[in-house]
Amino acid sequence: MLLVAIFIHEYEKKSKFYLDDKYYSSNEFISVEDLNEIEHDSYIMYTYGDFCAFSTPCEDIFKSFMDQYNISFIKMHYDNFKNTKYYKSVLYPPSVLIIKKGKLIAFLNAEDDNDINKYQDSLEFKNWVDKYVYLDKNS
């Protein structure tokens, strides 16, 4: 029974899904201070600090993606992010989190060399998001 539960959990993490409709309707950063109102939503979140060490500001890469696919991101300053349940997994800003019905599916790790290119290359970032999320709500 435990193996079945683990299999189902892993399948859900790997299966592609749609964001909630409201995140496909525009291409903006939606600033929030807490996640209570969207606790069960499916969305993409950008958490950031006061300093970005990347040569190209990663927010520019993310905004370009949002403009191209007409997708909005939740945006939360890292000081507020520390009070969320996701802080146990995402310890360093900046990061992008993919959330499915309130559960963390994937995130970019600013400390992981394998993720650095996704912060700096719009195609790499798009390919990463596309592994988890349908980019068009009509797909």
Predicted stretch roles:
Residues 1-23:
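N-terminal targeting signals for export/organelle localization
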Residues 17-34, 80:
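Short extracytoplasmic/periplasmic juxtamembrane "stem" segments immediately C-terminal to an N-terminal membrane anchor
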Residues 28-68:
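Local sequence-structure signature of Cys/Sec-based thiol-disulfide redox active-site neighborhoods
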Residues 47-49, 66, 70-84:
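Thiol-based oxidoreductase modules, predominantly thioredoxin-like and allied folds used
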Residues 54-56, 83-86, 106-108:
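Extracytoplasmic/secreted cell-surface and envelope-processing proteins
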Residues 87-100:
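Structural micro-motif
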Residues 98-139:
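Non-catalytic, surface beta->alpha helical segment in thiol-disulfide oxidoreductase systems
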